Amino acid sequence: MTTIHNQSRKLLLQALRQGASDIHLSGTREDGIIQFRLNGRLAPFQRIPLQTAERLVSHFKFSAGLDIGERRKPQSGAMDLILEQKIPVSLRVSTLPTPLFEAVAIRLHPQQTPFALESIPLIKRQAQQLISLMTRTQGLILLTGATGSGKTTTLYAMLQKALHMQNLHIVTIEDPIEQLNPAFTQFEMNEKAQLTYEVGLKAALRHDPDVIMIGEIRDQTTAVYAVRAALTGHLVLATIHSANARGTITRLCEMGVALHDLREVVVAIIAQELISRKCPLCLSSDCSPYCTWLNNRKRAAIFDILEGKALQEALTANDSSFDGLGKERRFAIALGYIEEKEAKNRAL
């Protein structure tokens, strides 16, 4: 193996052992800079010689199937590796040309056992609400939240819980597939092959599904087909970007979905947020990203779950200004799970 190959594997192993979700490789005129995304925060990791950084960039581009000679345009690609303990890891590599350096961001997706749904919410009563939703046989369940807030992790956990409760045919349509699961029929987008969400949804509906999961509703076509699939007697789960749970209604209306269709088909809208818990060692939520406390315990999710009467009121009023997550933050403060400073930072 070449030296740069060994260096790249060592870097990936260090990131995985630290629990990093992303690796950022950038540079100045003098040297290369490596940073890890740990618990939602960007943390400096290492400075390396500029020549080594440039060779690492070329290596990751080649491994991800990118054009190593193209340095003027952004590129994105993927690669799969087995690094440690025989756990496969999917890497999504993205490049961005800058005046000084071709920056690279690498998203890490370890293909390990999905989280149990009960372990995700900080407030345990919300786990039961999520489990209850998966007893539904039809309708549209939407998850919203910021990038990196754990929406897809929650979706996988909800699907896994549904599968444990009854034998179901679950079809997922994703870009990319983040967790391979042999119990699901998984379909990955490929724009070069003209495999879009629209194509995937049409194919999924012909595949006799009980449950359809859509990685993200991005445009009007996907939104319309998601609603149509739910109207034809399927349970559909999807993520969508909006400011809060109520803002999801406005977002879908802006995409051209009729409000009366939403009233008929939507069974729940879930806003999700990851918050930092108090560290029992540092006695604070503001401890070092490299704290030795187990990384997967440092953050937990809170939810604003709109269903039943509250959902119907939101669909009638269509008021996106109310943020239900604020109520859950205050509840978490009262229970001593998080600090008031953390809640205020999230509310900004």
From Swiss-Prot:
It comes from Halalkalibacterium halodurans (strain ATCC BAA-125 / DSM 18197 / FERM 7344 / JCM 9153 / C-125). One of its GO terms (biological process) is establishment of competence for transformation. Required for uptake of DNA by competent cells. Pfam families: T2SSE. GO terms for cellular component: plasma membrane. It comes from the Bacteria. GO terms for molecular function: ATP binding; ATP hydrolysis activity. It is found in: Cell membrane. ATP binds at G145, A146, T147, G148, S149, G150, K151, T152. Disulfide bonds: none annotated. This is Competence protein ComGA. InterPro entries: ATPase_ComGA, P-loop_NTPase, T2SS/T4SS_dom. PANTHER family: COMG OPERON PROTEIN 1, TYPE II SECRETION SYSTEM PROTEIN GSPE-RELATED. Keywords: ATP-binding, Cell membrane, Competence, Membrane, Nucleotide-binding, Transport. It is a peripheral membrane protein. Transmembrane segments: none annotated. Belongs to the GSP E family. CDD domains: PulE-GspE-like.
